[in-house]
Amino acid sequence: MTKCSFFRAILVAVGLMTAAVFATPANALVTLDIRKGNVQPMPIAVTDFQGDIGAQVSQVIAADLQRSGLFAPINKTAFIEKISNPDAAPRFEDWKVINAQALVTGRVSKEADGRLRAEFRLWDPFAGQQMTGQQFYTQPENWRRVAHIIADAIYKQITGEEGYFDTRVVFVSESGTKQQRKRQLAIMDQDGFNVRMLTDGSDLVLTPRFSPSRQEVTYMSFANQQPRVYLLQLETGQREVVGNFPGMTFSPRFSPDGQKVIMSLQQDANSNIYTMDLRSRTTTRLTSTAAIDTSPSYSPDGARVSFESDRGGKPQIYVMNADGSGQTRISFGDGSYSTPVWSPRGDLIAFTKQAGGKFSIGVMKPDGSGERILTTGFHNEGPTWAPNGRVLMFFRQAAGSGGPQLYSIDLTGYNEQLVKTPTYGSDPAWSPLME
């Protein structure tokens, strides 16, 4: 697959409904209110799609839904009806018997021009209706992405909120021994598949972050033994230094409009937070203290910035206006707080907390209230948000393990999942939804 098709797969979506069923009197269709917090996973039947790779597509869809913690795919051995014609209405009674609250059917076929056509229908067996249906045309190599898009459509139809399955994660791939650890910038699908290396591992890389356009990544590299923030074009592989500062620059992150990069600049024993306009290359200093100010993160509207500072004696989370005014501490619990990152929804700030010899991933409101710990372990760090603000990814170094691994967890704290990668992984950053 070319670099371009990796990020910009051509997809054409067409609505797909069964008129005879859709035209029946509307009953109350099944929904799942995820705003209530911990919910019982909904039993859903995802049938094998028709076609040569249909079973593979449905397997990815079921895996996406199950990993969200909101759905419980029913074992196929329990299915009574074997779907032979996905265009026809299923025998709803057969699916009600096994308590399938929702049913997914579909087909994958190849067009005369070589394109792949994937179609699905989502049914409510208890209402006896089709809920939605679509078909997609794309290149055959993009079949996994189509599966993620279908899973997103199902997620949105039932929960009323955007999904997060058609996304990428950029992270630091770690291989080799602890004494000779090789760290490369890498990118993958959110479920750990389609991993691709972006750097060759000759230089240490840290803290990669996506641009809002998904086409650029900013990160820190020790190229030429000089710590610098770089900007990498994902399609071309071209990279450039963001600014030429006398000290070390680190913890870069884009502004929501993609026009600026905010980062820390270390000079002498302290570091402060700066922004750089990517067009004019002008810099603006936001903090000016004798402390270490780092890990800045914009609110989704770009009006405020959260950051980490030890100005009070140990690392804590602060919030300020985007121009540097109104700097206010918001964390007051036991221990120290670091790596704050604002939710895409704007309602929460995720963080790493160190207390009692352990590291936790938690969330709090932007005013510091409502602190909740989601997971605790020997060493958990680096939370990053899914674009719908419902799930976090982070990395964990277990005691005595060879290296860090990536995990995801939802806001209930109950649905923790290992994200399998071919190497160790750290510093994940979630992309916005693909287009």
Swiss-Prot record:
This protein's GO CC annotations: periplasmic space
Signal peptide extent: 1-28
InterPro entries assigned: 6-blade_b-propeller_TolB-like (IPR011042), PD40 (IPR011659), Tol-Pal_TolB (IPR014167), TolB_N (IPR007195)
GO biological process, alphabetically ordered: cell division; protein import
Keyword Signal found: yes
Compartments, as annotated in UniProt: Periplasm
Subunit field text: The Tol-Pal system is composed of five core proteins: the inner membrane proteins TolA, TolQ and TolR, the periplasmic protein TolB and the outer membrane protein Pal. They form a network linking the inner and outer membranes and the peptidoglycan layer.
Described purpose of this protein according to its UniProt entry: Part of the Tol-Pal system, which plays a role in outer membrane invagination during cell division and is important for maintaining outer membrane integrity.
PANTHER family associated with the record: PROTEIN TOLB (PTHR36842:SF1), PROTEIN TOLB HOMOLOG (PTHR36842)
Name of this protein: Tol-Pal system protein TolB
Lineage: Bacteria, Pseudomonadati, Pseudomonadota, Alphaproteobacteria, Hyphomicrobiales
